[in-house]
Amino acid sequence: MSELQEEQAQVSNTKNSQKLIIYLIVGALITTAGIFGYTELYQKPLEAKAADAMYVAEKYFANDSSELVLNGDGTSKGVLYIIKEFSGTNAANLAKYYAGMSYYRLKDYNKAIDYLKDFSTNAKQVQAVAYGSIGDAYSELKKNEEAIEYYKKAGTHFPEDEAISSEYLFRAASFLELNGKNDAAIEIYKQIKQNYPKSEKGFSIDKYINRLQVQP
């Protein structure tokens, strides 16, 4: 290959590389614009509509009106509608929590578990309560192993909250006792004694530890 041909080949390769870079940049810009457009033109208005729909449902939830929370009152929609129609919004995610808790109050424990498992939040206290409520639902279904698993998750998810953590750890230990796992129960009782001595459960935890330790 002559020097001229080599130079032409290099120029061609450079141009191809530049084209590729341009295509990548344009593609990135289109993607960014698409995300921005989706957020501004679709997602934000959807979030606003979902939040408006949640307002009445939250009021019913505060009043323990579980059927109205789930299905609405004929004028306002319930959380089941919000979950379906506003999927992907923050309000729909929160609606899953309200749905799970409402089904629990109505003693429909399997549906409570399904909705609460599908809920997630960065608010650690709320997430801990959701885990604990799943544990409660499993306990009502006499599924003790599953209840213990979720009580432990609830009790360790946000250790800074003494009340929530000590309460759910205590429930985990209690169900370990029911399952005949006394050594494991003692370990959790001791964990409560060490980490949460000033909590409601911590004040009386010694009697549970002593009772198990004196058993033959």
Where are these regions (language model features)?
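N-terminal positive-inside, membrane-proximal cytosolic segments immediately preceding the first
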Residues: 1-29, 33, 37
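Short solvent-exposed coil/turn linkers within tandem alpha-helical repeat scaffolds
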Residues: 44, 83-92, 120-128, 156-164, ...
